[in-house]
């Protein structure tokens, strides 16, 4: 601790970074020490010099925000009399108890056989979803879908069997095989084993493609006719007043995100809700799990800025967890436990989500009009990105996505999907039934659930509440990854999460629809290794037919040879059918746009050309995704950890070096695979060119498609144009505007500034959450942390040490005071360099207009 004399230059520099008038600075310029300065700022005196900086936090914080903070009653004192900023509402705890999973059906069966009951579940408000016509209709529709899928697959499998050169196992004499050598057995049996494996792979994959086809077809008919008596959005008139007790919390869980973009979207959503006149029914929560000290400080400043600029004090709240348990689902659990009892509904937003006020108020009205609904999911529309890759993906989701979403609703009705964001949730049943316990056991598929959304929807339905998709409700938006590699990083997490969720397939009480959802979640990624295996087996069969002498006589005393067969007519028919199933949904999407109006998509010609280019691009990327997803599935089964880093939210180009590193193995695989096929049978290469050619081109395709310039040029040519670009809604215009403004004055080097900068330190101290009473062990730990920080400087502190300082208002204030009073060069130099390197920081000194100079 120090109370040393301060030089006029140092004092002047400190005062220059406080928003004061010249008269106020002149009055404080006579201070002989920083202790005296803080005492005069706080109008108090202290025995311990380093306590003065803590006491002046409130004064430093309110020099230019006093009126806003006082009007909203944001400044309060903690139990020790220290100033803190009321960034969250008062806590009213609610009991949130996850039910342990009993995933082993054999253990459950054994306990029943031996007369031992399972441990009793905690009492809950159980209910049964009331009988309704839509439930019967939904069941009938799903049986029809199952018949259509299986019927198509059986017919296609029969055709595929007829294409195979060796027809069945009937002429294989297994008794004779026992007396043969292993080589002779392999020579006879290997072609049949390969054919059977190929046929099995084909059946699974064709059934998967068939499900997508029928979903898109029914979605097309729903959207074309516009007649859907079971759509959830028809339950509300759309203009009835929202009851006072229908309070809704908009929660945005974030973790090391792009801070300017996050708070731009939040502000746009907030202002859109305010424009509806129903803002008093909504509160906004930013729930941070960030563990990067610089990002944490940037979040705090961004929260203060958005509250000040949008009038959000008392409506927009910010909370950062110190104990990051169970990732996003744990973050939501923590919110429900602290404040969930204060709200009837909760809308979950992703970090890149934007929702209009009309959409949000409509969701609340739909919940009020549908008392049996537990979750209503909107269909977010992708927009806001400029790279060529992202614009093609935006176009694909905007053009083809509505068919599949409407089709999902057609088959599932009130037993549908929840995608984890841009959805409204009924709070009481969610708290009682949807808390997620970790999966039992050890290994890669145990522990905290990664993909929580499907599981929460299944638990909500198991508890007797409906889960709906409001596929036709506008005003819900999200952003997509800017390039292929960022999308694949996200896919690895989703792959691991979906594979984990399949452990819940046989959990007692799950509705069959949600068991099917778990299955489709697995197939979304397991289809990749199945397709890869199908191609490998096909190549192996080619090698067998080329390199091995055909066995025309398979049985003793066989009179006639067994000739390999070839039916080109069946092959052409099967190939044509598969192409139709894959590409007809895209053509139907374009037909629907032609019928509804193609102007906002660039016109009929441009939207059709965009579809053809997107189809070509998707064909180039499909084999690349196949290889990556195969690796992800293998990695999950082998126990390789899936990191949970936040995806890139801004437009970002892929460097050549990164592309070579990630795609190099695929390029070599495609090259050697092509050489092998040419060596075996050059004519077969034409069938494999779409696969091996795409793999060999993966590096340039990945790099070129990530370019912003090409994306902007395609937009100038009205290619891949979507309505949100042609005529942007106000929420997206505001998001774009605020994102640019936030980036202009974004806070960099936040930790250094929180220690050295007078106002940033005051904000960090006011928001610090570790507010312990005075105790000798705590004081010793604080002194050690401050001493260590002064000794090693900002560069010598690891992230954990930085976070510990940010959490302790006393230690942070003491460190701030000693850095200035003792003139620690490393800290001051780092702070000055940070300000110098930031060309968009506010001009210094921060001097407000005097009362005489203020404009009228």
Swiss-Prot record:
Q: Where are the transmembrane segments?
A: 144-164, 198-218, 517-537, 574-594, 608-628, 691-711
**Stored CDD domains:** Glucan_BSP_MdoH
One of this protein's GO BP terms?
Answer: glucan biosynthetic process
Q: Which GO terms describe its molecular function?
A: hexosyltransferase activity
- Where does the UniProt annotation locate this protein? Cell inner membrane
Q: How does it sit in the membrane?
A: Multi-pass membrane protein
Claim: Isomerase is one of the keywords in the record: no
Q: In which pathway does it act?
A: Glycan metabolism; osmoregulated periplasmic glucan (OPG) biosynthesis
The entry's function note states: Involved in the biosynthesis of osmoregulated periplasmic glucans (OPGs).
The UniProt similarity line reads: Belongs to the glycosyltransferase 2 family. OpgH subfamily.
NCBIfam families, alphabetized: PRK05454.1-1 (NF003955), PRK05454.2-1 (NF003958), PRK05454.2-5 (NF003962)
Q: What is this protein called?
A: Glucans biosynthesis glucosyltransferase H
Query: Per the UniProt entry, what species is this protein from, by scientific name?
Result: Pseudomonas fluorescens (strain SBW25)
Ranked from the top, the taxonomy reads: Bacteria, Pseudomonadati, Pseudomonadota, Gammaproteobacteria, Pseudomonadales
């Amino acid at each position: 601790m120090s109370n040393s004399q301060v030089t006029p230059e140092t004092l002047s520099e400190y005062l220059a970074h406080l928003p004061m008038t010249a008269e106020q600075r002149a009055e404080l310029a006579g201070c002989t020490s920083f202790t005296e300065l803080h005492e005069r700022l706080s109008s108090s005196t202290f025995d311990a010099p380093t306590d003065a900086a803590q006491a002046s936090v409130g004064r430093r914080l309110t020099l230019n925000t006093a009126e806003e903070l006082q009007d909203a009653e944001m400044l309060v004192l903690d139990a020790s009399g220290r100033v803190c900023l009321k960034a969250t509402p008062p806590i009213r705890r609610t009991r949130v108890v996850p039910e342990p999973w009993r995933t082993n059906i054999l253990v459950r069966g054994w306990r029943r056989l031996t007369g031992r009951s399972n441990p009793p579940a905690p009492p809950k408000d159980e209910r049964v979803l009331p009988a309704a016509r839509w439930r019967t209709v939904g069941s009938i529709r799903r049986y029809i879908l199952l018949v259509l899928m299986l019927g198509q697959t059986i017919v296609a499998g029969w055709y595929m069997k007829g294409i195979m050169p060796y027809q069945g196992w009937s002429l294989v004499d297994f008794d004779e095989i026992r007396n043969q050598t292993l080589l002779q057995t392999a020579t006879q049996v290997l072609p049949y084993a390969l054919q059977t494996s190929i046929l099995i792979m084909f059946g699974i994959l064709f059934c998967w493609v068939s499900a997508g086809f029928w979903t898109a077809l029914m979605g097309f008919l729903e959207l074309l006719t516009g007649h859907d008596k079971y759509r959830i959005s028809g339950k509300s008139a759309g203009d009835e007043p929202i009851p006072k007790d229908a309070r809704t919390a908009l929660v945005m869980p974030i973790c090391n995100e792009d801070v300017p973009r996050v708070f731009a979207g939040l502000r746009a959503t907030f202002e859109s809700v305010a424009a509806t006149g129903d803002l008093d029914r909504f509160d906004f929560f930013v729930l941070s799990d960030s563990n990067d000290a610089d990002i944490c400080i940037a979040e705090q400043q961004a929260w203060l800025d958005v509250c000040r600029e949008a009038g959000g004090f008392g409506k927009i709240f910010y909370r950062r967890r110190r104990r990051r348990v169970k990732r996003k689902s744990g973050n939501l659990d923590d919110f429900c436990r602290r404040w969930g009892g204060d709200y009837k509904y909760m809308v979950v937003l992703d970090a890149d989500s934007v929702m209009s006020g009309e959409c949000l108020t409509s969701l609340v009205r739909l919940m009020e009009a549908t008392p049996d609904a537990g979750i209503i999911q909107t269909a977010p529309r992708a927009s806001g990105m400029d790279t060529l890759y992202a614009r093609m993906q935006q176009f694909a989701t905007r053009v083809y996505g509505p068919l599949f979403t409407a089709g999902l609703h057609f088959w599932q009705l009130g037993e549908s999907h929840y995608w984890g964001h841009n959805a409204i949730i009924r709070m009481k049943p969610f708290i009682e039934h949807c808390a997620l316990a970790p999966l039992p056991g050890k290994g890669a598929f145990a522990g905290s659930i990664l993909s929580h959304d499907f599981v929460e929807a299944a638990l909500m339905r198991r508890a007797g509440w409906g889960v709906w998709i409001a596929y036709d409700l506008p005003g819900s938006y999200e952003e997509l990854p800017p390039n292929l590699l960022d999308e694949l990083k996200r896919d690895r997490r989703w792959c691991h999460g979906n594979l984990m969720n399949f452990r819940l397939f046989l959990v007692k009480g799950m509705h069959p629809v949600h068991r099917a959802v778990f299955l489709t979640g697995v197939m979304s990624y397991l289809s990749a290794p199945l397709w890869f295996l199908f191609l490998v087996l096909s190549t192996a069969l080619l090698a067998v037919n080329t390199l091995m002498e055909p066995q025309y006589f398979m049985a003793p005393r066989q009179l006639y040879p067994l000739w390999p067969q070839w039916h080109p007519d069946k092959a052409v028919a099967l190939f044509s059918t598969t192409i139709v199933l894959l590409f007809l949904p895209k053509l139907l999407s374009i037909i629907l746009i032609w019928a509804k109006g193609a102007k906002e998509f660039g016109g009929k010609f441009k939207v059709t050309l965009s579809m053809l280019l997107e189809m070509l691009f998707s064909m180039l990327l499909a084999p690349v995704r196949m290889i990556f997803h195969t690796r992800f599935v293998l990695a999950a089964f082998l126990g390789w950890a899936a990191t949970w880093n936040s995806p890139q939210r801004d437009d970002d180009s892929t460097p050549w070096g990164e592309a070579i590193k990630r795609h190099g193995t695929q390029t070599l695989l495609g090259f050697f695979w092509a050489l092998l096929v040419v060596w075996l049978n050059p004519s077969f290469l034409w069938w494999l060119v779409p696969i091996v050619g795409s793999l060999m081109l993966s590096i340039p395709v990945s790099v070129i498609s990530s370019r912003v310039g090409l994306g902007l040029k395609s937009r100038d040519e009205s290619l891949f144009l979507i309505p949100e670009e042609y005529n942007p809604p106000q929420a997206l215009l505001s998001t774009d505007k605020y994102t640019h403004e936030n980036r202009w004055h974004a806070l960099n080097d936040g930790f250094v500034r929180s220690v050295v900068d007078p106002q940033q330190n005051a904000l960090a101290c006011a928001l610090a959450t570790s507010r312990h009473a005075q105790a000798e062990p705590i004081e010793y730990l604080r002194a050690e942390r401050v001493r260590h920080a002064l000794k090693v400087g900002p560069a010598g502190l690891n992230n954990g040490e930085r976070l510990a300082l940010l959490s302790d208002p006393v230690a942070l204030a003491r460190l701030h005071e000693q850095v200035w009073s003792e003139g620690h060069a490393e800290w001051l130099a780092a702070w000055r360099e940070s300000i110098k390197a930031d060309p968009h920081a506010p001009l210094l000194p921060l001097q407000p207009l005097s009362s005489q100079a203020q404009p009228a």
